Amino acid sequence: MQFFSTRDQNRKVTSSQAIAQGLSDEGGLFVPESFPQVDVKALCGLDYPALADAVVREYLTDYDPAFLTEATRSTYGAAFGGKAGYLAPVEGDTYALELWHGPTCAFKDYALQLMPKLLVEAKKNLGRTEKTLILVATSGDTGKAALDGYHDIPGVEIAVFYPTGGTSEIQRLQMATQEGANVAVYAVRGNFDDAQTGVKKVFGDKAIAAELEKRNIRLSSANSINWGRLVPQIVYYFAAYAQLLKAGKITFGDEVDFCVPTGNFGDILAGYYAKQMGLPVGKLVCASNENNVLTDFLTTGTYTAKREFFKTTSPSMDILVSSNLERLLYHVTGSDAEVAGFMQQLAATGSYTVRPETLAAIQETFSCGWSSEDEVAEEIRSRYEKDGYLCDTHTAVAFHVAAQKKRQGVPMVVLSTASPFKFPRSVLSALGKAAPENDFEAMQQLEAATGHAAPASLAALRSKPERFDTVIAPAQIAEVAMGYQA
C-alpha cells in the first residue's frame, strides 16, 4: 500500500514514511492509494485488539505483521480497562460508543497510545536514527493524549501548543502536569486555528527543516493530519457494528448511522474509511457546535473560515479550519490540482466553493447539524433525567443533532468522545446545579449529584505539580522548534 499527497499525486510514500513524516513537503496530507476490501463478517467475530490488528495491517503493509499483532494487543488491553470500543445502550435504537475509557479519558487515546509504537517502528523500517521532534496543536484532548503516549519514548521530543483560555481547566492541567523528560507545553495567545496555523507554518518552512536536519532532527506530527492518527480510529466503527450484531439488534448487512461531534474532521473521516472498506455505514452525521463552519459547508458547498469565533463549552470543537476535510475532498474529486486550488483559496481569502456535483457526492454519505450552547446544556440535562445517561458537552452536541437526523428503523450510534468529568463545571451547570469556580470541587459535586465516579486519573490531577506555564504568540512556535538540539 502506497500513500500520496492530496496536493500532489506524484509524491508517493510508504506507510512508514507517511507516519514518520506526518505532512507532505508541499503541505498536502497523505491518503491511501486505495481502500482495501475486508471480510466484515469475519472481523465482527474478533476481540478489539485482534480487530485493530486486522484493520491496521491492511494499510501498514511495510510493517512486520508480528509487530502489529503485538502492538495492538499491548495497546488495547489493560489501559482501556476492558472497555475498548464499548457500546452503551441509551434510548431505543440509539447508542453511545464510549471512547473515553483510555488513560486520558478521551477518544484520542485510541490512536495516540498506538501511534508512538508505529513511529518508532517506522524509523526502524526506514533505517533512521535521527531525533524526531513532534509538534502538536491541540484544542484540548489531543495534547494530553499525545503527551501521555510519547512521554519518555527514546529518540522523540514533543512540544504541545494549546490556545490560552481555550480548554477546560481539567484539560489544561492534564497537559501542564505531564511528566516526562522529553515533553514541553505552551499556551498560545489566540484560538486553536492560530496554534494550528503556527504549527503548519513550521512544517512548511524549508529553512527550518534544513537547519533542524543539520542537527539530526526531523519534524513530525501527532495531529490528525498524520495518517498514523487516522488508521486506528477506523477500528471502533467496526467494533460498534460487531456489538450490535452480537446483541441481535441488527442483521448482517443492515445499515447503521453514526453521529460524530466534529472539529478537525478526523474522527468522522475514519467512519468514511470504514464505509469504503465495506462496513455497512449508512449516514455519517457531522455534529458541530456554534462554530458551525462544517454545517454550512456540507449544506451549501462553500467553506468560509473568516467568521466570528465562539468559545464554547465544547472546546475541542472550537475550530474554524478543519484540516481533514482536505482528505475527503481529494477522495471525492480525485483531483490533487483541484484540492491544491481549494487550499490556496482558503489561505488567501479564507473561503472556497466546491462544484455542485462534488457537494452532491459528499451529501450521499454525510449529513450535518449543529447545537447552540443552550441546546447543549438542555441535552445534558434531559438525557440524564430521561435515560440516566451522563454525557460531556461534546457528546451532547452529537446527541442533539442525532435526534434531528435519526432515521426510522436505522440504529444511530453517537460517538461519545470524552468523559463528562473533563468538563465538570459545564456538566454540573447543565444539570441545574450551581457550579463552583474550582473544577475539582465541581468534579466532587458532580459525583455526588449523579452517583458516577470520576476517573482516577482526572481526580489525581489535583495533587500534581504544574510544570508548564509559558505563554507565547503564534509566531513564536517557530522559535520553539528552532530551540531544539539533537
Segments predicted by a language model, with ranges:
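PLP-dependent amino-acid enzyme catalytic core
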Residues: 1-486
